[in-house]
Amino acid sequence: MKTRTIVIFAFLASAISFAKFSPCIGFNWATPGQYIHACYSDLPSLLGNRSIGSGAWAFSGEQPVEYPVITGLVMYLTAQLAEVTTTYYLLNAALLALLFIAVALITARIRPQFGYLLSFTPAVIASLYINWDLWAIATMMISIYWFDRKQYDLSALAIGISIATKFIPVFLIPVAIYIFYRNTNLKGAIRYLAITGGTWLAINLPVALTTPDGWWYFYKLNIERVADWGSLWYALSALGIGLANLNYLSILLLL
C-alpha cells in the first residue's frame, strides 16, 4: 500500500477519534459529561490534578505523575508550553496524532499487507487521545522494525527507550530472547539485554537519584492498584467476583 494512502487513513482515524473526544472540550471535561459522552482523557485531567499543573517538575511535589520518566518529561514540557487546560489538551492531541501516523507508517513497513488495518481498529477511534501511551508504542514499533531487519543494537536501544516511556513493552523482551535462543545466538541475547538495560538505566537513573519518591510512584501505584475502569477485572468486581493478588495474576496471564 502506498505511503500516501497510509497517511490519509491514519489522519482520518485520528480526526474521527478527535471528534469523538471533542464534546469534552465544550464543557471543560466536567463530570458527569465526560463519562456520558465517553470523552474522558488523562491529558487535561492530570494537568489539573498533578504537580505539573503548578509548574513543578513531573516527579517532584506532593502529586507526582503516575508515568515513567519519558512520559513524565513529555507531560512536564508540554505543561510549560501550554498552561491552560484546553491548550494543553490540543497540543498533546496534535503530538499524539503525529505519532499515530508514524506508527501506521512503521506498521506498513513491517507488514505492508496490514498497513491499513491499524487505522480501522475500533480501539484506535475509542482511545487515541485518552493518554500518552502512543509515545511508548511508537518506539516499541521502531524496535520491532529494527529487530525484523536484524539491526539488533538499534532495536535494543529503541525498546529501552520504550520501556522508559511505558512499562508494558518489557514483555517483548522474552520474545526477543526466545528468538535469539532459537537461533543459538547467546552472545546476541546478552548484548541485546545489556543495551536495553543500559538504555533504560541511563534514562531513569538521573530521576531516580534526584527525586526517588516521585520516580518510584509509578511502580508503587501499579503494584498496589486495584481493578480500574475499562478492565475486565473491574467488570468482574462489579459483579461481586473479587480476585486476590490481581496484579500478579494479570502479569502471569500476560506472559
Model-derived regions, located:
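Primarily membrane-embedded glycan-assembly and transfer machineries that use lipid-linked glycans
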Residues: 1-144, 180-255
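Membrane-interface alpha helices of multi-pass inner-membrane proteins
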Residues: 123-126, 143-144, 153-178
